[in-house]
From Swiss-Prot:
Transmembrane segments: none annotated. InterPro entries: eIF3f (IPR027531), EIF3F/CSN6-like_C (IPR024969), JAMM/MPN+_dom (IPR000555), MPN (IPR037518). Signal peptide: none annotated. Residues 311-327, 342-357 have a biased composition (Basic and acidic residues). One of its GO terms (biological process) is formation of cytoplasmic translation initiation complex. Keywords: Cytoplasm, Initiation factor, Protein biosynthesis. Residues 309-357 are annotated as: Disordered. The keyword Aminoacyl-tRNA synthetase does not apply. Pfam families: JAB (PF01398), MitMem_reg (PF13012). This is Eukaryotic translation initiation factor 3 subunit F.
Length: 357
């Protein structure tokens, strides 16, 4: 029977004995890429809302797994058709096999990690599907199958949970439809470029024109510094209120602040300013050298093409002189000597004509 608990203790996963020599028992951590979450949300939005269909959707998780099996990264997903009612659940196994084969053919380095659903409810049907994805024939065996739940209710925040299963206190008769779900840590990954793009899209959503210009790097740096300054003021205000006993403190937040302060370099403000100025000078020097090299390349290209242009002009002038000489030769043959032509023989003098009466 599936068990759901809000507060959990992360224990080493208990696995059944395997014949493949896999004995890893380290805790599991799940990393989720944003495109995988968007794919799940798109599947939930486009689901069939007829009464005969289930209120939740399911699909497969595809990604990479570390060598020791302690970390998995969910990179993509694909939907799996299924029907679910009060008595039974049916999954299109052939569709799942074909889609998995196509996905692995497009991304050979990825593998099947588990499955997802758009409901936080864990029941006997969830155990059946979990055992299907963890089986040796169609699942992730000998590695545990990851079960990811994502809430997609309109107007509500998106909440995610990750589980693995263990055959703990399960009778052999009910092993196929029973398992113990153990919640494991998970984290949503995103890069700095994705965060910057999301910030630009958010800024466009707050304007009436629904558009936002792409600012330069200097303006982006200025905005980042302003944001950091605001965050420091908020943290300072929170710490001051806790010290003045105006609000209750948080042990988790205090530990996080201590860890963040321990990472700060133990240097003076003067040294930081000097290092920053040196860095700026290095950047300016690199920019100057890049512009100089670009100018030299342009100049070398112009010098390399200059003789070709001059040779074409000289050849054109010589061609014109030859054409004039040829024309003169033809004129000399006709008449008594043209430009560049041979002299013709003198003609006999004509008799003067008598004037007409």
């Amino acid at each position: 029977m599936a068990v759901e608990q809000e507060h959990f203790v992360h224990l080493a996963r208990p696995l059944a004995p395997t014949s493949m020599g896999f004995t890893g028992s380290a805790p599991l951590t799940v990393h989720i890429q944003p495109q995988a979450v968007f794919s799940v949300i798109d599947h939930a939005v486009r689901r069939d809302t007829r009464d005969t269909q289930s209120t939740r959707v399911i699909g497969a998780l595809v990604g990479t797994r570390s060598e020791d099996g302690s970390e998995v990264e969910v990179r993509s997903t694909f939907a799996i058709p299924h029907t679910e009612n009060e008595d039974q659940v049916e999954v299109d196994v052939e569709y799942q096999k074909n889609m998995l084969a196509l996905t692995l053919k497009a991304s050979p380095r990825e593998t099947l990690l588990g499955w997802y659903t758009t409901s936080h409810e864990l029941n006997s049907f969830s155990a059946l599907i979990q055992n299907f994805f963890a089986s040796p024939e169609t699942g992730t065996f000998p590695h545990p199958a990851v079960h990811l739940t994502i809430s997609t209710e309109p107007g509500a925040p998106i909440a995610t949970k990750a589980y693995i299963s263990a055959p703990v206190a399960v009778s052999p008769e009910r092993a196929a439809e029973s398992c113990l779900f153990i919640e494991v840590p998970h984290k949503l990954l995103f890069s700095d470029a994705e965060r910057a793009a999301l910030g630009t899209a958010t800024a466009a959503a707050e304007t009436e024109a629904r558009s936002a210009p792409v600012i330069s790097d200097i303006e982006t740096l200025a905005q980042s510094l302003e944001s950091v300054s605001d965050l420091l003021e908020r943290v300072s205000g929170f710490v001051g209120e806790v010290l003045d006993e105006e609000r209750d403190g948080s042990h988790a937040l205090g530990q996080y602040l201590m860890n963040a302060l321990s990472l700060a370099p133990k240097v003076s403000a003067t040294q930081i300013e000097a290092d920053f100025n040196n860095h700026v000078q290095d950047v300016l020097m690199v920019s100057y050298l890049a512009n100089t090299i670009r100018t030299q390349i342009d100049l070398a290209q112009r010098l390399a093409t200059a003789p070709l242009v001059g040779g074409d002009k000289e050849g054109g002038e010589k061609g014109k002189d030859g054409e004039d000489g040829g024309r003169g030769g033809r004129g000399g043959k006709r008449g008594g000597g043209g430009r560049g032509g041979h002299r013709g023989e003198p003609r006999e003098p004509r008799e003067p004509r008598e004037p007409a009466e």
